[in-house]
From Swiss-Prot:
HAMAP family: Ribosomal_uS9_B. Belongs to the universal ribosomal protein uS9 family. The keyword Ribonucleoprotein applies. It holds the Pfam family Ribosomal_S9. Keywords: Ribonucleoprotein, Ribosomal protein. It comes from Alkaliphilus oremlandii (strain OhILAs) (Clostridium oremlandii (strain OhILAs)). One of its GO terms (cellular component) is cytosolic small ribosomal subunit. This is Small ribosomal subunit protein uS9. Signal peptide: none annotated. InterPro entries: Ribosomal_Su5_D2-typ_SF, Ribosomal_uS9, Ribosomal_uS9_bac/plastid, Ribosomal_uS9_CS, Ribsml_uS5_D2-typ_fold_subgr. Transmembrane segments: none annotated.
Amino acid sequence: MARVAYYGTGRRKQSIARVRLVPGEGNIKINNRDIEEYFKYETLKRDVRMPLTITDTLSRFDVIATVAGGGYTGQAGALRHGISRALTKSDEELRGTLKRAGFLTRDARMKERKKYGLKAARRSPQFSKR
């Protein structure tokens, strides 16, 4: 018998997360490591679990995810986005709850590029009067 799985892809900053939801007890594996081992900060762990918590599906699904690129914050955001998309595929009625929470919207904010003549994206060189 084939196992039921729901897939979702999430993106945030430079990070891309491929998420697979399978029926289970609520275990979250990221790049073959447990969530407690992968993320150091409790805020990031809470951020990843938020779509499951808000829809009361934390104990119904196991999350198996592959994340690449970016830093920890971007990866946590990408996971949240991917989990939300996979949850809508599992049950279309959850879409309204996730949409109201803003989890289905791709956060389009990216790092601003450095411009020539400046030290950073907006920081100008130090002004010298003489």
